Amino acid sequence: EDFTAIGSCIQKEYVYQIYNSRIRDAFLEHRVCFYPQPLDFARLERAGRAFEGTHDFAAVRSVGTETRTTVRTVHWCRAERDGAMISIAVCADGFLYNMVRAIVGTMVYASYGKIEPEDIPALLATRDRRLTGPTMPPQGLYLNRVWYDGVVGDMMNQA
């Protein structure tokens, strides 16, 4: 009776997909982010792990957005590669506006050496959006899973 789809959610997982190839795939147009420059996947993975844990994520939100708190817990930030397709899954107890796209942009920066993956916690601590990577385009961002507490959540997660 007090259930709301947004308010009752205890955690969510978003997936961001990057097609890392110099040649665009017409079948993926408007469905993924095309990124033609080669990415160092090992650095990308290390950067993702640096976001895990409880942090103040003000440095990876849209400038000018207001929330009660910018502290969130990222349960995992994992990258997988299948040929040219890179999928980045980010699961957290909540998200700020454009947070996933900015996290991925920061991971991409780390992938080609603009920042060091190990410096990401210090960059987050500055709360300065200008020090982290760009907000990636919306193509490629998908809400993948949501978790709810109690009976409703159990039924939803079994689907």
Where are these regions (language model features)?
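Structured-RNA-binding interfaces characteristic of tRNA pseudouridine synthases
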Residues: 1-159
